[in-house]
Amino acid sequence: LLDADVRVVPKKGGQEIAYKVSRSQLLTHGGVPVFGLYADYQNQVEVTAKKRFKGQVETVKFIYTIYAGPITGIPSGAPHEKSLMFKANVKKVSKKFADRLYFVNNLGTPNAQTMRTIWNNPMGGAMTWQFPPKTVIIDTKGEIRWFLDYRDLWKPEDPYSNGVMMGFHQNPDGCLTFGFGQRYAKYDLMGRKIWNRRLPNAYADFSHALDPAQN
């Protein structure tokens, strides 16, 4: 594969997501990364790609049917909780911004699992604030087109792997940097870990910003 164009076919009345995939991203992911699938839905994805085969370059087109599973998370058991994710209510959209995507970082409701521990020190940090993350990308129709499945990196039973996720930045390479509790991390939108590190011991907890340096 030399390059690719991807189009996620929108639901009826929905918002199209279409993008180009560079050669470097094809090599990084070992194939075509697909972004913007509707959760718990049978998506149609159109892929147009250039490939070199036996010395010849040709353009090919494929249409894939891809079911994406439902949004996942840790339910709190609170009586007011009606779903694992909040709903977006779109009031008005300007036509020139109709193709925009919005990154939203929100907080879930704590439950018994997330409230087991606290630093045994009156000068402790943010461990008390054990809100599970609700981090999504929504389109201008209010549909969730990406969500952070935090279950593999945010562990309520581990005091060094939980805490409020904050300070999200999208870097020039497209990857996200952020911090939570005793950690700071960098992942791409496909869920590939670049790094996930403990804070130095001199820090109490992560709060609230993480600014990537020029290098």
What are these regions (language model features)?
Residues L2-P10, L27-G31, Q42-N215:
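Histidine-/acidic-rich catalytic cores in large beta-rich domains
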Residues Q15-L27, D152:
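Solvent-exposed serine/threonine-rich low-complexity stretches and specific carbohydrate-binding patches
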Residues V34-A39:
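Short, flexible loop/turn segments at beta-strand junctions in immunoglobulin-like
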